[in-house]
Structures are given as C-alpha cells and as structure tokens.
Amino acid sequence: LFGYLTGMATALVNMPTIVTASLAASLVPVISEAIAQKRGDVVMKRTDTAMRLANLITIPAFVGMCVIATPISAMLYATPDAGPCIAVMSFGVFLLGVQQVTTGVLQGMGKTAIPFINMVISASVKVLLSWNLTALPAWGVLGAAWATNADFGVAAVLNLIFLYKYRRYTMDVLHTVKLFVAAGIMGAAVLGAYHGAFSIIHSNTLATLAAICVGGVVYLTAIVVIRAVKPEDVQGVPKIGPKLAAAVEKLSFKI
C-alpha cells in the first residue's frame, strides 16, 4: 500500500512543482541583488510575482489531480488503487509550491537557516502524524499522505510568518481566491468531461486525456474572465512569457 503513496502519488505531486522549484532557485540571486542594493520595493515585487505565478500553476494542478485522481491512477499505473492517495496528496501541490517559493526568497535574503529550521520542525510534525494516523485502521496509508501534506503546510506557513516579520510580506488573498474559483470551475468541467467522454468512448485513457484538455481550456478562460491573471504574472515564464503576457493583455481588453 505504501507503494501507492511513495512510488505513485508522490511522483505525481512533484511533477507540477518542478516549475516552482526552478522559480524558487531563480529567485535567490535576484532577491540577493535587491537586498544588496537596499531595494525593498524590488524584493516585494519579485516575491509577489513569483508567488502569483506559482499559485497560477499549482492551484489548478491540485484541483485537477483531486477530481480525477482514480482515472489518472488507472491511466498511468494501470490500477485505480492509487487514486485515494493521489487525491489526498494533491493538496500538497499547492502547499509545496508556497514552501518552495518562500524558501527561495528567504535564502535570497540571506536567512538560509530559517527555512532549514522550519523544514526540521515540519518534518517532526510529519513523523508524529504518520506514527499516529497510519496506526488507525480507518486511515492507514492515507494517514501518511495527510501527514505529508501537513509537512508541506507547516513549512509553508512558518516561512510566510518569517517573510512577514522581515518584509511585511503577505500573500495576495484576493488573487489566490480568484485562482481557486477558476480552478473550481475547471474541476467541475473536468469531472463532467471525463464522465461524458467515458460514456461515449468507453476508454479511461482517452476520457482522462480529453478531460485534461477541457480543463486546460476552461481554466485559461476562467482566469481571464474573472481577472485572476495579469500580463505581469506570466511575463517571467521562460521563453513564452512575453507572448503569454501579450495574449492576456489582448484578451483582458476584449472582455
């Protein structure tokens, strides 16, 4: 059973956060330079942009994985049994993204010990929860999955507390709520598209792929319609950032 968690669910959770990990790594020298120049405004702007971009990616990934976790498990691993673990671990995508970005900012500020200490604390929480939750028959391996989410969440919250302490930085709540609304609309569309496609073609793989495509279109449309994305939010995306920013600006103007 733990193979479903460590070999399947965890691997899927780490895929979307590859982008946020790269984003966090790129933040370190940028923040360090701004700190050296005593440009607090640049630190805040870079931090906010990075967090908005990370959430733009991780929130829909979390919702998408959660609503069609079992079909994804069946498609990738030829078994639906990893579905519950994937559904629970999907929450960790968003939390891990926040942790990675805030860690990058703190390291860039020269506070390298803080994220390390926070990770030690969060890891201790994970061990404690895993020890207790997995022993419960009703939880089992899902207890370990929730403990992993708690690990990411505790580290993310502690990092945010220190960012507020040193820079008075807080996440843009309205922007985050808008992204969750857009992702919720997408999640409903994904679920409906999967069941609709499966009832017609009777193929889990094709129905899952169709649902993912529908979800992508719906999410992109939703974030533009409800103004959850601005050109500057996607400007920093490697290679395609300027084109994405121009497209968002044109679409926003038309709507």
Would you name each region that the model predicts?
Residues 91-121, 131:
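Membrane-interface junctions at transmembrane-helix termini in multi-pass inner-membrane proteins
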